[in-house]
From Swiss-Prot:
Entry protein name: Ribosome maturation factor RimP
Keyword annotations: Cytoplasm, Ribosome biogenesis
Gene Ontology biological process terms in this record: ribosomal small subunit biogenesis
Gene: rimP
Function statement: Required for maturation of 30S ribosomal subunits.
Spans traversing the lipid bilayer: none
Gene3D superfamilies referenced in this protein's UniProt entry, alphabetically: RimP-like superfamily, N-terminal (3.30.300.70)
Cellular compartment(s): Cytoplasm
NCBIfam families in alphabetical order: PRK02001.1
Record flagged with keyword Cytoplasm: yes
InterPro entries: Ribosome_maturation_RimP, RimP_N, RimP_N_sf
Disulphide bonds in the chain: none
Stored PANTHER family: RIBOSOME MATURATION FACTOR RIMP
């Protein structure tokens, strides 16, 4: 079995033991540096990274193939990629970039095809001078989202 396939198989086995964790990204470069990015339904703890790292490291032979292994959690600054990530962030504010707009909106609902968000903006009054606050509620298809990042509010 090729090295990359062996790593993928071991990773799948490791994640099967921890169903609350899921893979965001797996990258194996030409010098056999393995970079695994994880997320979890309840976040990712250091021990989760250690457990997945050990499930791979303990089953690969460094005498056979020299490699480096890095297991990390998806940071808050990384864009959301999977529906499962959107689901765990319902009720949080996202910065969403599409081809036509960039908005900061509250994530209300998540389906397999799209998300529903709500945000407000100041717009000119239809009658008279000045501006009024308008609340927008919109469904955005995943295909239309170029980037979505969770905004951390302190």
């Amino acid at each position: 079995m090729a090295f990359k396939e062996k790593v993928k198989e071991l990773l799948e086995q490791g994640l099967a033991e921890y169903p609350n964790l899921f893979l965001i990204d797996l990258n194996i470069n030409d010098s056999n540096k393995i970079i695994i990015t994880l997320d979890g339904d309840n976040g990712v703890q250091l021990q989760d990274c250690i457990n997945i790292s050990r499930s791979i490291d303990n089953n690969l032979d460094r005498e056979e193939v020299d490699f480096a292994l890095e297991v990390a959690s998806a940071g808050v600054s990384l864009p959301l990629k999977l529906v499962r990530q959107y689901k765990k962030n319902i009720g949080r504010t996202l910065k969403i970039k599409t081809a036509t707009q960039t908005i900061e909106a509250l994530l209300l609902e998540v389906s397999d095809q799209d998300i529903t968000v709500e945000w407000s903006s100041r717009e000119p009054k239809k009658i008279g001078k000045g501006k009024e606050t308008v609340v927008h509620n919109e469904k955005i298809a995943y295909a239309a989202i170029q980037e979505a990042i969770v905004i951390i509010i302190f």
